[in-house]
């Protein structure tokens, strides 16, 4: 459980060449697509009434391959070595961009459209391998940081491609500039891909099914047939792209009609939104404690709604002028700042929302299904984006809503969709409550938690100071833990939801309720036999004076039935807090106090006697109660 910064990945060959390759791909997608749209709108000789039709055709041609070829991309990602597959896709990109370059140089719209469809196909085939290679290249504790960097790179590349297209298309020799830019970027992407280390095929024996319609349906069913946490994460991921597509497509018109701005204002808003997502994606690693922390998803969802509502509420505050505002003039208006802050906030919380979802899908999907499940995610993403376009047409055209009112509808829909997801998968809410507690009421620090094994069974033993010990431990330790706790604590209102969802084990004294007592030991043995972590509080009760009480003999029974390593833990700084039994406690007395979790070296079964364990835990805790 090493705790290195996500930025160290940029210095490692197992990540950096892939990061450069995927970022250049996202950049080139948007450089070419946006250049083509600008050419249709301002450069090519077309009937004025036809231009909007051609622009909409561009959107269709780019997204159609995700429906047609994502299933093939999923199969390819499992049958072939991922490094070789990426190189083949990037080599094809050079040919596709050569066709597009020829189209620009000759003003041949048909060639440009063929190239656009080709780039959509390139992205549809690249998507499954893009996300399924990460768990092969990264350790589990690096997965959130790696996904954060990928999302940051993707959205900044999208922004750079969009801006780059505008710069190139404004030059007199735009055709040459675009042609050289897209082909040159494709070549650089291929060269970067040659440095990606070997990523072996996970199912080389797979027989490819070339029936794209049959396979698309089968893969979509596979994705949505995963565990509820994975399948609803796929839905949540697609919902993010639904929301993002609406905001991104409306930004140009919003900047013109509601911010009364020129083209520089459009660029400013796009920049703020993209930088916000990049920032939120990067912050995920720090906020999650370098583990797959799905508790950030409800937090991100809350922010998406809050800042969407703020954006709607403050729209209309910016006054019009004789000439459109440029970006500097807009920044000088106090009325615009709430809108701009809302846009950044949307991006930041969007990053909090999407990165943990991607990481969960990767971490909890079987290796031999991962690429196909991600392909299913891409198919659903495309479907949600098409539905978002249809909904936008209906609400803005038929219902005659304004753009801010559309943002209001999206913000309210976000509440409904995520309430459904969190109801089906209460683990999201449970992890959010744990995350909120450990990041709001306390400043939780930890030492030597790398002593807890990354995999395999172990028994954790810890002193028992407060009603929230299990929540704090669960929030700090990367692996899921099954806690054994006194049944009356387990049944506490609100907390019972958290404990039950986490699979905690209620226990009573043998003389108090023998059925609960025996059932608890049976479940402990079951969890340990399955290779999970189980945590017990051997005192059997909360401390009444802050000191560590006698450890009871239940640990002997556990280890006799299922011999596993024992890891001693100690909680420091919780005594006197609101959730302890200190008579002098108060809600604000130790609010935001420093709490430390310390792990000791593993103790072999034969040495794990109650008195010896108590001595180890006492030594770890020291004098800090």
Where are these regions (language model features)?
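Substrate-agnostic recognition of the 12-TM MFS/MFS-like secondary transporter fold
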Residues: 16-34, 58-96, 111-170, 186, ...
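C-terminal ends and interior cores of transmembrane alpha-helices
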Residues: 91-107, 302-332
């Amino acid at each position: 459980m090493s705790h290195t910064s996500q930025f160290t990945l940029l210095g490692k060959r197992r990540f950096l060449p892939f990061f450069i390759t995927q970022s250049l791909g996202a950049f080139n997608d948007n450089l070419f697509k946006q250049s083509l749209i600008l050419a249709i709108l301002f450069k090519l000789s077309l009937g004025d009434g036809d231009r909007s039709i051609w622009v909409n055709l561009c959107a269709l041609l780019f997204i159609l391959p995700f429906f047609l070829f994502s299933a093939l991309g999923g199969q390819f990602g499992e049958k072939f070595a991922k490094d070789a597959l990426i190189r083949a896709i990037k080599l094809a990109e050079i040919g596709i961009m050569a066709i597009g370059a020829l189209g620009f140089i000759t003003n041949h719209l048909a060639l440009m459209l063929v190239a656009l469809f080709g780039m959509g196909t390139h992205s549809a085939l690249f998507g499954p391998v893009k996300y399924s290679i990460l768990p092969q290249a990264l350790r589990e504790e690096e997965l959130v940081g790696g996904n954060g960097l990928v999302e940051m790179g993707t959205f900044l590349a999208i922004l750079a491609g969009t801006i780059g297209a505008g710069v190139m298309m404004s030059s007199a020799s735009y055709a040459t500039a675009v042609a050289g830019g897209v082909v040159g970027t494709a070549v650089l992407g291929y060269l970067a891909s040659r440095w990606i280390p070997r990523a072996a095929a996970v199912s080389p024996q797979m027989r490819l099914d070339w029936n794209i319609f049959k396979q698309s349906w089968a893969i979509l069913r596979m994705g949505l047939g995963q565990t509820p946490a994975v399948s609803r994460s796929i839905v949540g991921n697609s919902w993010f792209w639904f929301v993002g597509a609406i905001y991104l497509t409306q930004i140009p018109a919003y900047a013109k009609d509601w911010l009364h701005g020129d083209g520089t204002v459009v660029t400013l808003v796009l920049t703020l939104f993209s930088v916000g997502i990049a920032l939120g994606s990067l912050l995920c690693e720090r906020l999650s404690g370098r583990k797959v922390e799905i508790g950030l998803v409800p937090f991100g969802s809350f922010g998406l709604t809050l800042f969407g509502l703020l954006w709607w509420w403050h729209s209309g505050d910016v006054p019009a002028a004789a000439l459109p505002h440029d970006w500097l003039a807009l920044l000088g208006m106090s009325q615009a700042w709430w809108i701009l802050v809302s846009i950044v906030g949307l991006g930041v919380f969007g990053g909090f929302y999407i990165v943990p979802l991607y990481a969960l899908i990767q971490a909890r999907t079987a290796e031999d299904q991962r690429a196909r499940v991600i392909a299913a995610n891409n198919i659903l993403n495309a479907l949600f984006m098409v539905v978002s376009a249809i909904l936008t047409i209906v609400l803005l055209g038929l219902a005659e809503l304004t753009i801010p009112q559309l943002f209001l509808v999206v913000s309210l829909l976000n509440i409904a969709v995520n309430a459904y997801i969190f109801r089906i998968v209460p683990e999201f809410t449970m992890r959010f409550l744990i995350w909120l507690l450990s990041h709001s009421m306390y400043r939780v620090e930890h030492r030597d938690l790398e002593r807890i094994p990354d995999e395999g069974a172990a028994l954790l033993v810890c002193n028992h100071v407060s009603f929230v010990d299990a929540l704090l431990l669960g929030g700090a330790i990367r692996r899921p833990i099954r806690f054994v706790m006194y049944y009356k604590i387990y049944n506490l209102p609100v907390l019972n939801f958290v404990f039950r969802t986490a699979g905690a084990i209620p226990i009573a004294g043998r003389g108090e309720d023998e059925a609960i007592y025996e059932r608890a030991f049976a479940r402990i043995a079951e969890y340990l036999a399955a290779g999970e972590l189980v945590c017990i509080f051997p005192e059997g009760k909360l401390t009444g004076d802050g000191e560590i009480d006698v450890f009871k003999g239940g640990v002997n029974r556990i280890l006799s039935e299922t011999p596993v390593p024992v890891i001693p833990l100690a909680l420091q700084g919780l005594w006197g807090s609101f959730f302890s039994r200190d008579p002098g406690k108060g809600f604000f007395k130790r609010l935001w106090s420093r709490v430390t979790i310390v792990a000791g070296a593993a103790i072999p079964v034969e040495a794990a006697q109650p008195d010896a364990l108590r001595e180890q835990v006492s030594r770890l805790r020291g004098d800090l109660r």
